[in-house]
Amino acid sequence: MTLVDRFLKYVSFDTQSDESTGLTPSTPKQMVFAEYLKTELESLGLEDITLDEHGYLFATLPANIDKKVPTIGFIAHMDTSPDMTGKDVTPRIVKGYDGTDIVLCAEENIILSPAQFPELLDHKGEDLIVTNGKTLLGADDKAGIAEIVSAIVYLKEHPEIKHGKIRIGFNPDEEIGEGAHKFDVGKFGCEWAYTMDGGEVGELEFENFNAAAAKITFKGRNVHPGYAKNKMINSIRVANQFIAMLPSTETPEQTEGYEGFYHLISIQGDVEQSTVSYIIRDHDRAKFEKRKEEIKRLVAQVNTEYGEGTATLELRDQYYNMREKIEPVMHIIDTAFAAMEAVGVKPNVKPIRGGTDGAQLSFKGLPCPNIFAGGLNFHGRYEFVPIQNMEKAMNVIVKIAELVASK
């Protein structure tokens, strides 16, 4: 089975996660895919294959050299985003992309166009795997899984490439921020690992957001609107007032690079009670803490104006910037950087404007930066992946294994 065949098979599994269930895996269909992968890894002759009740699949490619070298790992997630359906994915290969519009769905006039997605033009002449416009593709992160498995197959078929012990891990629920929650780092048994979960070719990431979630509930007082003067407190208006207090320029659509933000993700309510939910993000830990303090200050300000208990805050940290855990072991970044250069890929070290399982794993004792998997426009109908990107990612995995063994 080729890399492409493997990827096309993997995306046929619907593995959408769901944060509302409170289970791990959050959806049983992820376990169906995990069982398939387990069978495939068994057929490939890998060792120490385990699949636990939470959907964490681990396996080993034994070393083919006698000298002691570090055990390293490669990790990818099995779930796809809750943002769009991953059921009945029908991929299509556009061979030798010519730089023009790609019609994904003619009857609904869904078009993947370089006018809206100029990154398409970086892949003229390449072979693109696209959707039919009705689902996401699932390259996030089934491209990563296909690349890891294909790299392991390549190493098995080329014993002249010397490598140490390699562990691979496939986990559920990354898309809902829970992929690392039940990941047994001790059982995985690596000195370090890489998630294959980045986007464009060359991406190498060891900085991510510090992240928190805030839920603010506003209580109102409902009376007949005809007799409401000096009596009614409309919780919707109080919520709107709170929203307006936050800086309008510090939102996702107006920030980039290392700039943090407050992101209003939902608002629900009526006169009696309204709830707003935010995610808070910043790469800088001090600025991150300051953002949380600002939320607390504004909640207190609302209560000063309308009465204690009008606004209540639930605030929780979600994950932290892995940079502080990676900097003491920067040789793992140097190795990935060198591997990319060795296979003709220009490394692009950049901060992640998001989080990865690797960030949480790094704080659990497994340093775990992120490497490109090659897909673009994740989480929607315009997602695509150039086949050549996946091939390069696979080559990087092979080269990392070779470089670690050569030191």
UniProtKB/Swiss-Prot annotation:
The lineage of its organism: Bacteria, Pseudomonadati, Bacteroidota, Bacteroidia, Bacteroidales. GO terms for biological process: peptide catabolic process; proteolysis. Keywords: Aminopeptidase, Cytoplasm, Hydrolase, Metal-binding, Metalloprotease, Protease, Zinc. Cleaves the N-terminal amino acid of tripeptides. Binds 2 Zn(2+) ions per subunit. SUPFAM superfamilies: Bacterial exopeptidase dimerisation domain, Zn-dependent exopeptidases. GO terms for cellular component: cytosol. It catalyses: Release of the N-terminal residue from a tripeptide. It comes from the Bacteria. This is Peptidase T. Its cofactor is Zn(2+). HAMAP family: Aminopeptidase_M20. Its EC number is 3.4.11.4. Its main location: cytoplasm.
